[in-house]
């Protein structure tokens, strides 16, 4: 919220924004009083830092620098405080290695920043010590956000972009916690929202009221040796019996090498309001873990055949092998970088590998012909993101081939097995989404396509039979710092050889890292904003909101 917003607090919209900002700011500045510093620092790291700097503090080579084994002198600590408070971008050298990435500012109070940096100082062989809230406050005063309050107030919600002709766009609710998935029975009365830590909330679409349904601490399995808590919970859907399914990914270092465990929880009853309740483990599988690039299960959905389809992503960026270490192991396993099919009606389902070579399937849906269309996020090597027609038994290239490239993405890219044939992505014929005068397969590198929906006959001509794809936006430094941050409309048609090709138009832009879309009610699409930033230099600490795009009433 900015001073400009303060001038309009007399009206209802302004008052609502002020209340939301106030609640967020209050939580930001008082959360540090609830737990002991060691626990709080670890949990803050898991929520805000682990995705890029990894569970072992090693970072990602060339992109996100390590926090383990670096300069933690007084000058180094001051530099770390400054980066957390105001962000950083551009080339830098850490431990003699060059990095060229982006770190957005993290919206935390002085005490919380002190706690998370104290956790870092006392982890992974770092020298130990303690950072105080006073140290943070003194360094922050010299940054472009001189107080925590000024920083929080600067992170207002972006204005809504114009709705396309024939539609309305409205804000349904502002979220108390960042959410990654939506699910519903499709009737348009309510949405269920999944946070990345596993909390589930119910959103009343008529009133915008949000209430907790069940919390991660009450149902997620905990084991000695767990790293993070959990690593990611990113998939949620209903089965045909109305049971809610939630997939969690957890790394555990009790075994050597460390493992990644996927657990799918399933609700077992309804509460007094008729909402799903009491989730319990239904399916579990483990395979060798990795400190970086554990994409694991990121989407699942019931198909037209009644089976549960589960996208289990790659455990590496490009299929590389590690010879030793706590996360040792080969590149991929037979059940990673692929699409599973499970029978939701049996108590101990077996994995059928439905399709292979899929690096990171963040979304898929079926059209009115029963064809599955899937979004796929690409590697750090700047290959285009993909849109694929998924057919049983096919291989979609990973880790041997990205997009429709004929060159290797990396010097270490493994050679494919003899005779293996790849199915290439759908070509984008423009005008948007990465098209730059010649067809591309399929979207801008690092634009991060997320969920996907197919629009049926309850949408107007020009939209009926097309797909909507939100794009989370780039996390890696690129020439275009605003690649993604939008919702695309994708129209597919067959070329002379029978292959699908796409016409892609930008429908909504800019948005605050849109991550999922969901159909609920006739002619209504719900869009989930993960946070509020509309370019990759903006903080993604503050939680986002749910928007409704609806066919306008005639």
PLM ranges: what are they?
Residues 1-15:
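N-terminal secretory signal peptides that target proteins for export/translocation
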Residues 157-163, 231-233, 250-253, 269, ...:
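Beta-propeller domain segments
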Residues 28-36:
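Bacterial Sec-dependent signal peptides at the C-terminal "C-region" and cleavage site
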Residues 34-35, 94-168, 172:
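Flexible coil segments in periplasmic/lumen-exposed cytochrome c-class electron-transfer proteins
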Residues 134, 155-316, 372, 446-496, ...:
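Acidic, Gly/Ser/Thr-rich repeat motifs that build Ca2+-stabilized beta-propeller blades
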Residues 35-60, 73-86, 173:
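Sequence/structural segment immediately N-terminal to covalent heme-attachment motifs in c-type
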Residues 16-27:
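Bacterial N-terminal signal peptides
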Residues 58-95, 100-110, 210-218:
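Gly/Gly-Pro-rich "capping" loops immediately C-terminal to redox-active cysteine motifs
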């Amino acid at each position: 919220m900015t001073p400009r917003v303060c001038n309009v607090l007399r009206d209802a919209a302004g008052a609502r924004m002020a209340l939301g900002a106030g609640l967020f700011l209050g939580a930001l500045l008082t959360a540090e009083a609830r737990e002991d510093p060691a626990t709080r620092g670890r949990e803050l790291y898991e929520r805000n830092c682990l995705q890029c700097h990894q569970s072992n503090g090693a970072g990602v080579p060339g992109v996100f620098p390590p926090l383990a084994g670096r300069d933690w002198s007084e000058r180094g600590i001051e530099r770390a405080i400054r980066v957390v408070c105001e962000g950083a971008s551009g080339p830098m050298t850490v431990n003699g290695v060059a990095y060229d990435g982006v770190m957005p500012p993290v919206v935390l109070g002085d005490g919380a920043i002190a706690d998370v940096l104290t956790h870092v100082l006392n982890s992974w062989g770092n020298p130990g010590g303690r950072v105080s809230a006073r140290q943070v406050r003194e360094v922050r005063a010299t940054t472009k956000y001189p107080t925590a309050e000024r920083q929080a107030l600067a992170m207002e919600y972006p204005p809504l972009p114009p709705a396309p002709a024939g539609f309305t766009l409205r804000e349904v609710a502002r979220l108390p916690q960042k959410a990654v998935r939506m699910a519903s029975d499709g009737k348009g009365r309510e949405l269920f929202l999944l946070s990345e830590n596993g909390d589930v909330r119910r959103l009343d679409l008529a009133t915008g009221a949000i209430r907790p349904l069940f919390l991660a601490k009450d149902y997620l399995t905990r084991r000695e040796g767990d790293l993070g808590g959990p690593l990611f919970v990113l998939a949620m859907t209903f089965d045909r019996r109305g049971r809610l399914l939630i997939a969690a990914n957890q790394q555990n270092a009790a075994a050597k090498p460390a493992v990644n465990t996927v657990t799918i929880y399933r609700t077992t009853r309804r509460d007094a309001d008729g909402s799903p309740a009491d989730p319990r483990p239904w399916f579990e599988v483990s395979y060798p873990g990795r400190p970086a690039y554990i994409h694991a299960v990121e989407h699942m959905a019931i198909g037209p055949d009644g089976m549960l389809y589960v996208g289990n992503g790659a455990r590496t960026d490009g299929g590389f092998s590690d010879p030793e270490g706590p996360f040792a192991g080969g590149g991929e396993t037979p059940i990673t970088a692929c699409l599973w099919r499970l029978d939701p009606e049996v108590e101990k389902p077996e994995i059928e590998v439905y399709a292979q070579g899929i690096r990171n399937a963040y979304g898929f849906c079926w059209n009115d012909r029963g064809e599955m269309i899937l979004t796929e996020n690409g590697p750090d090597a700047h290959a285009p993101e993909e849109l694929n027609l998924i057919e049983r038994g096919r291989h979609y290239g990973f880790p041997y081939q990205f997009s429709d490239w004929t060159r290797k993405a990396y010097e270490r890219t493994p050679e494919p097995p003899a005779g293996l044939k790849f199915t290439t992505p759908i070509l984008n014929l423009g005008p948007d989404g990465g098209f730059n005068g010649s067809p591309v397969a399929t979207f801008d590198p690092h634009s991060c396509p997320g969920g996907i929906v197919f629009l049926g006959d309850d949408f107007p001509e020009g939209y009926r039979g097309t797909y909507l794809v939100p794009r989370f936006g780039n996390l890696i430094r690129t020439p275009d710092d605003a690649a993604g941050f939008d919702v695309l409309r994708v129209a597919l048609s067959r070329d002379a050889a029978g292959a699908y090709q796409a016409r892609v138009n930008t429908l909504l832009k800019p948005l605050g890292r849109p991550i999922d879309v969901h159909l609920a009610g006739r002619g209504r699409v719900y869009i989930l904003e993960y946070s509020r930033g509309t370019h990759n230099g903006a903080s993604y600490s503050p939680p986002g909101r749910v928007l409704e795009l609806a066919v306008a009433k005639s």
